[in-house]
């Protein structure tokens, strides 16, 4: 995947495709309209988050595998992506990443919620760009730090220190610009005039994933996400009930997306917020039980959960869908708090938690380098979790950190 994205990284500016040097693609299509150029999506770059996410993935792969050879191979592409963030992504020099389409044919909104009406103010008026999405700033923070870790692993100390300084500068500015005490969470976005879109959204949950939010803010964001207006019983809605454009049957303004919830779960785990994490997992697990073949769909409607009834299907949701499928592993990883230390040949389970209805988890062939391990984890009274190694192949250590 990293090589695939790197091979398609933009090398020149092309307004028709929203392409700029170093930018990572948003999507590629092979239909007739794309092939004839009627729509710009043959190879389209109108996504403000794909580029920092690419850097995050490259850093995560290095930390997971210790593969410095691949990191060295990808480094020119990581450098180009970071350069795009600085030169093109930050449109006005304020340190935040913003977007705005360059032609009328491009996407009006270029975050993961790319519906035309997905970014708005509390009164329902659409935000005018360039728009700085809240979650994208968190991704940028993680990308600067991830790039720094790659640079340091490759012996580029001066570069690493410069990237760390950029991450710290963004962290200092972020909270002041985005925090909205009146709604108990971060703003959905800043518009082109730097006015906050004071809307309760799932986007704010992604902020927990990268460490840009202080601990006290993370706890407050989690509480807001798990309020009935946001948490429908099956998962966190994209937009909270009561917001101006809330519609539980809409694509991005009140529905529930498993991948969205998976990222929130990882953030909750990072901050040690175990109770909301277990509650979130319970909703998604129950939703899967009601779905055909026990799969999580791309999304479902955000109507409140009722006794004896499953979630309301979104009629044209993909099933299966890659994002949704990955969310199951994200949530499991969040529960178990699994991290990898290739340099120490160690797998760690940090503050693992299992919900009351899940007594045991068995994992086979969990790999680290050329070694692997089979293990089982049990839940005990008092929410304690124990671990037992069943089989070990090669040199590998397993540790539980509570």
Give the ranges of each region predicted by the language model:
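Substrate-binding cleft of carbohydrate-active enzyme catalytic domains
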Residues: 1-7, 11, 36-92, 126-145, ...
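Extended, well-ordered alpha-helical scaffold segments
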Residues: 1-8, 68-86, 139, 143-147, ...
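Extended glycan-interaction surfaces of carbohydrate-active proteins
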Residues: 3-45, 91-132, 172-256, 289-313, ...
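Active-site-proximal structural scaffolding
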Residues: 47-50, 71, 78, 133, ...
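Well-ordered alpha-helical scaffold segments within catalytic/enzyme domains
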Residues: 53-70, 84, 136-157, 206-217, ...
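Beta-rich accessory regions
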Residues: 150-177, 181, 268-279, 344, ...
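Active-site-proximal binding-pocket segments
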Residues: 255-261, 272-281, 288-296
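Catalytic cores of secreted or luminal carbohydrate-active enzymes
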Residues: 314-362
